[in-house]
Design a protein with these regions (language model features):
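Secondary-structure capping and boundary motifs in well-ordered enzyme cores
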Residues: 32-41, 86-93
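Short acidic, glycine/Ser/Thr-rich loop/turn "cap" segments at secondary-structure junctions
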Residues: 30, 44-47, 77-82
Length: 150
């Protein structure tokens, strides 16, 4: 169980300042700001566990997702410090937020969360333009086409 507490990592100074996805210094006093969301690996089991044992942290995580959305234009996929690593596919912040919302964990702007979920998921990135046009993502056009189609 202690392995579930290794990451995400708190990524702010004691006064709430942190470097955002836009590389600027921001300040938060409303929530703790985190990084190293390996959401590809954790959205299925670890984050649902957090909704049971760490509701406050779950709210902080979602508020962090929304701050990253404000600063960088999308929610994190697999972020490291103030960088989008672009090394995973999918938008796994979406099921994390949906699960928390359905469990009544909502100390964040729910309207903004819905906007961020739609914006992040419907960008014509990761082959989505092919899926919209022909119903699948051809392997000749995108790597990991089967996973991205599914």
């Amino acid at each position: 169980m202690y392995h579930t507490m290794i990451a995400p990592n708190l990524y702010q100074d004691v006064d709430g300042r942190y470097r955002g996805m836009d590389l600027k210094i921001h300040q938060t006093n409303e929530f703790d700001y985190y990084t190293v969301f390996s959401l590809w690996d954790t959205y299925r089991a670890t984050h649902p566990l957090y909704t049971i044992i760490e509701q406050d942290k779950t709210n902080d995580f979602i508020n962090t997702f929304l701050a990253k959305y404000d600063e960088g234009g999308i929610m994190p996929i697999w972020d490291l410090s103030e960088n989008y690593t672009d090394c995973m596919i999918g938008y796994h912040a979406v099921p994390v937020i949906a699960d928390a919302f359905l469990k009544g964990i909502r100390v964040y702007d729910t309207e903004k969360a819905f906007e961020a979920m739609k914006h992040s998921a419907f960008q014509d990135k990761l082959g989505l333009k092919y899926y919209k046009k022909i119903g699948f993502i051809p392997m000749e056009e995108e790597s990991e086409s089967v996973s991205k189609t599914l």
